[in-house]
Amino acid sequence: MALVLVLNSGSSSIKFQLVDPTAHATDDPFASGLVEQIGEPQGRVTLKHAGEKFVVEAPIPDHSAGLALAFDLMGEHKCGPTDVEIIAVGHRVVHGGILFSQPQVITDEIMDMVRDLIPLAPLHNPANIDGIEVARKILPDVAHVAVFDTGFFHDMPPAAAIYAIDAKTAADHGVRRYGFHGTSHEYVSHKVAELLDLPEGAINQITLHLGNGASCAAIRGGKAIDTSMGMTPLSGLVMGTRSGDIDPGIVFHLHRQAGMSIDEIDELLNKKSGVKGISGVNDFRELRTMIDAGDQDAWLAYNIYIHQLRRYIGSYMIALGRVNAITFTAGVGENDVAVRADALSHLEGFGIKIDPERNALPNTGPREISTDDSAIKVFVVPTNEELAIARYAKALSGA
């Protein structure tokens, strides 16, 4: 079996999957795992393979040691590089800037270009680079492919991509809307075309990637024309711990009046805001339990979340003019029945009708949750970014 190793390297973790790029979207990966607590006194590698789970705990000083330990564990359980045919390695890279609209076979020149983008993603791209460098050393004889989170939004119309600030300042410092979760939005939009049995060029759709991070996209004829995240993943929808859209003047106010540093405000808006900032929790299952128990802060957090979601859905319906489908994906979007119903509950005037029984069905795969006579189809489509990355990697590797 020809497999692609898919890596998602974070600052202190590495997610990995061995994926058959020809597999069905609902198939489990051949193997998957997580290296975590890199740089801490005690790290952990978890591997899932053949219906079993294996865990090793050991010091993991850096990404190189973490990936080596993961490969050792995979080898012990007959799914390592010497046991299976790895035809390519696909790497998730968060920020491609204006340089990359498509996945790229990684060369030394491409690596230099990705390094140049670190100022745009100082929390993410360095970790992505670490993972690529380590993997290229361990697997030097296969193609390594970078798939950029921003790529799908690269060619948005200027009216959506350009911020109304001094043009020279923006150009000098790379300030514009880049968008994120692009691999997920693109993957889901392809699935919607299959569900509608229409060519993508004939479809206008809104995709809602609702996880701890959340974003939405307006897609016309297979091309993104707008998205909620901006220069960074902080803007747009209310998220688990991120504020989403706020008045930029709040940053100045907190700096001047509260004496908060830029780093403190960064931490506040990225890690201590959103649903967690209002309710104290960012897990929607916990939030629902608190709401059911009568917790008013939880109820307020939920209402703010839904209010912002409706605002974006409504504005994208106007931007698109005609909408064939609205689709929910990612952890909250795929599993939270109430969020889906409430997000669309004030849009009946557009002819959107949710079927409560269909909406309440468990998350078993792509499915329609609107009524047969709904003017706009509503779908739930489980995202599979790893499979999308694996398919890109296979295609570009020539294997």
UniProtKB/Swiss-Prot annotation:
Site (Transition state stabilizer): 181, 242
Encoding gene per record: ackA
Keyword annotations: ATP-binding, Cytoplasm, Kinase, Magnesium, Metal-binding, Nucleotide-binding, Transferase
InterPro entries tied to this protein: Ac/propionate_kinase, Aliphatic_acid_kin_short-chain, Aliphatic_acid_kinase_CS, ATPase_NBD
Name the UniProt record assigns to this protein: Acetate kinase
Cofactor: how bound: Mg(2+). Can also accept Mn(2+).
Cofactor: Mg(2+); Mn(2+)
Pfam name, any one: Acetate_kinase
